[in-house]
UniProtKB/Swiss-Prot annotation:
One GO term (biological process): regulation of cell shape
PANTHER family linked: UDP-N-ACETYLMURAMATE--L-ALANINE LIGASE (PTHR43445:SF3), UDP-N-ACETYLMURAMATE--L-ALANINE LIGASE-RELATED (PTHR43445)
UniProt cross-references to HAMAP family, sorted A to Z: MurC (MF_00046)
Gene Ontology annotations for the cellular component aspect, listed alphabetically: cytoplasm
InterPro entries membership: Mur-like_cat_sf, Mur_ligase_C, Mur_ligase_C_dom_sf, Mur_ligase_cen, Mur_ligase_N, MurCDEF_pg_biosynth, UDP-N-AcMur_Ala_ligase_MurC
Pathway where this protein functions: Cell wall biogenesis; peptidoglycan biosynthesis
Organism: Staphylococcus aureus (strain MRSA252)
Positions with a binding annotation for ATP: G108, A109, H110, G111, K112, T113, S114
Enzyme class at the top of the EC tree: ligase
Catalytic activity, as annotated: UDP-N-acetyl-alpha-D-muramate + L-alanine + ATP = UDP-N-acetyl-alpha-D-muramoyl-L-alanine + ADP + phosphate + H(+)
Name of the protein: UDP-N-acetylmuramate--L-alanine ligase
Amino acid sequence: MTHYHFVGIKGSGMSSLAQIMHDLGHEVQGSDIENYVFTEVALRNKGIKILPFDANNIKEDMVVIQGNAFASSHEEIVRAHQLKLDVVSYNDFLGQIIDQYTSVAVTGAHGKTSTTGLLSHVMNGDKKTSFLIGDGTGMGLPESDYFAFEACEYRRHFLSYKPDYAIMTNIDFDHPDYFKDINDVFDAFQEMAHNVKKGIIAWGDDEHLRKIEADVPIYYYGFKESDDIYAQNIQITDKGTAFDVYVDGEFYDHFLSPQYGDHTVLNALAVIAISYLEKLDVTNIKEALETFGGVKRRFNETTIANQVIVDDYAHHPREISATIETARKKYPHKEVVAVFQPHTFSRTQAFLNEFAESLSKADRVFLCEIFGSIRENTGALTIQDLIDKIEGASLINEDSINVLEQFDNAVILFMGAGDIQKLQNAYLDKLGMKNAF
């Protein structure tokens, strides 16, 4: 039995990958910071040991998986090289695993995690599917036919993968600390397209995805009859969103998603396209779609009296707009209150005006101090720069959290990729619901 040690095991992808290797029968442990991170819950539930960083964690006969946030100068990586152990980066190791399956990569600036979660759930309704989701969830099912996984474009990590299929949800400028501009992002996706072995499923309304060239067929999905697979007759019901699906202009079937918002229909179309191409049983696919419960930190709801408190990972202007749209469609008679924590100074600086525009779609806006990262913990701007651009916006922290109680009939959206859950939990504690998230 191989013994794997994950350096940075609480990272969302690393946590998922560690769980997969554990499920497949390997001995797994890892190390990370001692501060609480939500991904550790799933690790502890599976009995996977989490250690504080220490060179003495590294033993003979281990394979060491190196998280992308950690340099080769990290004490555990140094010790591994001293012991002449195999040290493999996260993305290279994942690239080796997927070659054993019919693999489906889900990539794009936005919607990766939600789509991967939906894909894994729906495909498991018909065929065994192992999966790696960017919310820290992973499962390795013995004798799986398929492997669904999230493929991140950051630092071109997804170029380590050669999947059978790729779902490309969109191309957008993000990660301004790495990508120079939208053309740089496009070039990365174009290179990724040449790694795909069977087919690409891409959103038809994305002007950049329409320019992608590949050595395999590209199937576009959307709401237009010119798309290869499209949805029509969309109806919002108390059970979710119902819609008809057409493939190559011919009626395919009627589907019901328990979610709300145009972006959730698009995610479903991408998943349905994969199931269609792989000739999965449509009855099983429909049933699985109707039972999808979502993924962690993507519009996760808690209802207290007339308030709906939502935990969401949205940290880019387009994601914020989509989250607000979902709230308005699902709760049309409630006020929408946005509580947002910007993630990284470089992203806040690059999208300052766009953040202001998207957040202004809420009825009220509260902002937290900017959350830094391992690579970047200071910047040339402050949260006041964003507050000044949004009418009626104000600063919020744990000491002033009680201001949210005044919104009696509202959806309270806690959004961000940092530690905004501390603020959520402070509010829930005040309301008498401890540790809901």
